[in-house]
C-alpha cells in the first residue's frame, strides 16, 4: 500500500511541477491570449492561457477591444490585447534543438484611450527580425481583413528560451505595440534543400533557415481549418481560387471519400490527407490543353528568396508516363525539357503523396512584375505520354530570412486611406495591470494538481470532433497590396442611420466631399440612372475618378437596400465584382461610391448605341468575366450570395474591358449551397426574372442562372430582354430565343453584325448553355460553375477556329474555381471513372474522352 501511495505522490508531484514551472513546459504547444485574465477556449476548441507568466516586462497595459468586427468568428484571442509603450519581452521555454512554429495574432481594433493608427512597432524572435515599423492597421486595410495572422517557422538554435521582443517605433512620437495572441508549437523538421530554379546544379539550404509562411493552399479543394490539419500543427489550408490567373481555370479532381493516402515516403505532418485527395488539372481536352496552361500569381516582398513547395498525389492513373507536364516559376523552367514532372514516376504508385521544393529569388530590380511569383503548368510531349494534362494538389510558399531579417515594408495606402481623417489624440492608458501568479505549496497544491488532471482526463473522454470552420484569416498577401476597405472604425457618426455593422465596414465620406466631387451633383456628370437613383461621375482625394450612386427619395429601394449593398459588397474583393469604396449617409442623402468603370455597361455596347460593335470573341470574354463574378458570389464566400438582379445594365466594363458585376441592393444570402432555398418577396427586373421564383417565391442561386441565360441571349442577339413594340411571341427575348432554338432558326435572330463570324461549334455550345440556363425548373439548370466551364469551352472553340495562339489577356485573371472548393464542374474520381456532370451530353463526353485516351484522336 505504501508503495502505491509513493507512486501516486510522485505522479502528482510531476504534474505539480509542470503546472508551476514554466521552464519545464518546453516541448509543449503554448497558446497565449494576451491581456486575458483567465484561460479561454476558441471556437475550434483550442485552449488559450493568459500571457502573464511568460511576460518579463513590468508596467504593461492590458486592454479589451471596444468593437467586435462581425467577421471575428472567435473572440479568443482577439478581444483582449497586451499594449506596450516601451520595449517588452516574452520568454517562452522551448527545446533549442527543435524547429518551432510561431504565430502572432493581431486585431487592429479600437482600444480604450488609443488610436490604432498610431501603432507602429517591430517584433523580433531572439536575434531574428520578424516585423519592422509594422502597422497592423494599414496591413489589415490593404488585405481587407479585420484581423491578421503572421506565421513563422523558426530554425533550431542553441537556446532553450524563445525571446519575443516588441519594440514601439521611434519614428512615430505616439507609437505603441500590441499583440492579441501568441502560439508556439514544436514541429518536426519538414525542410531540407530546395532546387534553385534556373540553376540546375544549385540548391538552397532550408534546414537551417528561418521561414515566414506566405501562402498555404489546398489546390482544387475547400478550405481546411486548423482543427483538421495533420501532425497537430493546426495550419489552415485555403482554396487556391483567388490566385488563378488568366482565363484557363481548368477543372478540379476529387478522390472518393474512402480513398487511402499512403504516407510511405514522408511524414503525415507534411500535409493532411484532404490536400492530396483533391487537385486541379487543365481539363479533359488534350488538344486544348496543349494550347493553354494553368497559372497562379502571388504578390510578395522583393529582395528575398522564396521556397515554393508543390504537393502532388495521383489518385486516378496508375502507370508512369501517363501524365507528364512542365513546371515554370517566374518563367523559368523548374521541371521540363527532358526532365518533366511525372507524379507516378516520383512516387511509384497511386495514392502515394510527394512534394517538390523550388527556390526562387525575387529581385526588386527586375521590373515588370518584380513583386510577383508566377507558377505555370503545361502538358509535356516528352516521351509521348498517354494524356496531355497537368496537375497540382497543394501549394505552400515560404519566405527565407536574409541576414536574420524577414520584415517587409508596410502596404502602400490607397489614396482614400491616405487622406482619411480618422486621427485622434493618443491619450494612453494609465491603468497598469499586473497579474501575479503565486504558487501554493504542500498538500493543497498537490490536490489542486490532482483535481486538474482528473478534470482534464474526463474532458478528453467526452470531447468529440469539431466541425467548425477555423476563424483564422489567410496569412497571405504582401506589403504592396492595396485596397480601400477600412477595418478600423466601428461606427459612423454625424446622424448616420446605418446599423453599426454596415457603418464599420468601409470608408464614410462627408456630404461636402461628395458635393465637391460632383460639382454639387451637376446634371452634366450623370452617367446613368437606376432603381436606386442617379449615378454621377465624380472625383475624390484630388484626382481619383469614382462613380457615385445617389438615392432618389421616391425610389422603392431605400435604407435596407443601401445597407445590404454596403454589408455585402464591402466584404467582397474579386476581379469581376465592382469595388465599393465607401458611402455617405448625411443630411438626408444616401450615396454609394464605387470604382469608376470608364466603358460603362454591357448594354451600352450591344444595341441602341453609337459605340463600335463588339466582336464575338470580346462578347464571350465579357460573358466569362461576368460568370466568374456570379460564380464567386454563389460559391466563393462563406455563405451563398444570390444577386437577384442580373442584367446587362448591371455588368460594367473597365478600361481594359474587364467585366464586373454591380448593383447588390437586392442581393440575399442563401442557404450555403445545400440545395435549399430562401423564401422572400419577389424582386428583380422583368424580362430577366426567374419564372419559378416568381411562382413559388423561393429564391435559389439558380434564379441568377436563369437571369444570366437571358443575358447570354442578349449578348448573342443584341436586343432588349423585353421589347413591347414587337409581336406577342417576340416580346420576351428569353421565350423567343428558346422558341427559335427548338425550331432550329436561332441563326435568324442573332446580331446581324455577327453573322458568318461565329464558329458553328462555338455557337452551338453557347446556345445550348443559354438554353439550359432558361430551363423552367431550377433543378434542370446548370450551376454557374457549369456555365463558366461551357463558356470557356466555347471560347476555346472560337479561338481554335480563328487560329489564335493565345488568349486575349485583357479579361484574364479571376478568383474562382470550377470545382468542389469554389464550386463548379468537379471531376469526381471513383473507381477510375470520371463524371463531368450534366453539362455535357453523353456523345460529347465520349468524344472528349476518346481524344484523351487515344492521342492520335487529337
UniProtKB/Swiss-Prot annotation:
Protein origin, superkingdom: Eukaryota
Extracellular face residues: 28-431
Transmembrane intervals: 432-452
Membrane-topology descriptor: Single-pass type I membrane protein
GO MF term set: ATP binding; protein serine kinase activity; protein serine/threonine kinase activity; transmembrane receptor protein tyrosine kinase activity
Tissue specificity as recorded in UniProt: Expressed in pollen, but not in pistils or seedlings.
Glycosylation sites per record: 133, 293, 303, 331
GO cellular component: apical plasma membrane; pollen tube tip
Record-annotated active site: 645 (proton acceptor)
Domain Protein kinase: 521-794
Catalytic activity: L-seryl-[protein] + ATP = O-phospho-L-seryl-[protein] + ADP + H(+); L-threonyl-[protein] + ATP = O-phospho-L-threonyl-[protein] + ADP + H(+)
EC number: 2.7.11.1
Keyword Ubl conjugation: no
Compositionally biased tracts (Polar residues): 843-858
Stretches assigned to the Cytoplasmic side: 453-858
Predominant location category: membrane
Protein keywords: ATP-binding, Cell membrane, Fertilization, Glycoprotein, Kinase, Membrane, Nucleotide-binding, Serine/threonine-protein kinase, Signal, Transferase, Transmembrane, Transmembrane helix
Positions of the UniProt region annotated as Disordered: 800-858
Misc remark: Male paralog of FERONIA, a female factor expressed in synergid cells that controls pollen tube behavior. Named Anxur after the husband of the Etruscan goddess of fertility Feronia.
Family membership: Belongs to the protein kinase superfamily. Ser/Thr protein kinase family.
PANTHER family documented for this protein: OS03G0124300 PROTEIN-RELATED, OS04G0586500 PROTEIN
Name of the protein this chain belongs to: Receptor-like protein kinase ANXUR2
